[in-house]
Amino acid sequence: MAENNSQGIDPALAVQETGERQLSEAERRAAEEAALDDGSMTLTAHLTELRSRIIKCLIAVALGSCVGYYYVEEIMHYLTLPVGKLYYLQPSEAFFTYLKVAVFVGFLLALPVVFFHVWRFFLPALTRTERMILGVIVPTSVVLFFIGLAFSFFLVLPAAVRFFMGFGNTELEALFSVDKYFSFVLTFILPFGFVFELPLVITILGKMGLVGSDFLGRHFRLVIFLSFVLGALITPTPDVFTQSMIALPMFLLYGVGYLIVKYIIRN
């Protein structure tokens, strides 16, 4: 105490300054919440917030990419399990493929952060009810997207690779380039992430009253046809096998959405 007084520091004044800083911080937070509630943010404030959130999303992707590159050899090990050994045909091909894998993993790791900042940016324009609804929809969509990727990678992709490798013989041996193989894997699994959003989309449409269980039930045959058409459009190969691997889950997910609309939303 004597030392503090000798240095000219008043303990009471220090406590008062600390309390003022805490009060100003609380007031700042209260002002931000009030601006979110009444949507009174100016255009400059919106642009500043947009810039801040974009930077945070890019930082999240960059950090996720660093994590992905740190574990890139382990990731490549799991990616190559369906085919075994891969080759690179150019000196820089392996390096740039590793970078692509790291950035893709970084994007997946940062996806919840990106969705969160997108949701927070549009929050001032939403009512409290809409905020509660989006608070359920956004996490659900992220979970369904990852389930679709996992379903494709662990179940569909190995079967598809075995199917394509079955065309080899003694005169025709498979030789996979690491870059071409990763591009194939990427274009193969991504559509499943979006396809698995189908039950959520149907549920939202049913909740809004735009579709009902009767409407969904009457169009089952049309859905089967459209599932194969969409499977042909979004698959990287023109064969019926790959199209069926997308069309069948799409049809089953449509059935899940139908059951939700019929038995849950109706009640």
Predicted regions, residues:
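Membrane topogenic/interface segments and analogous intrinsically disordered interaction regions
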Residues: 1-267
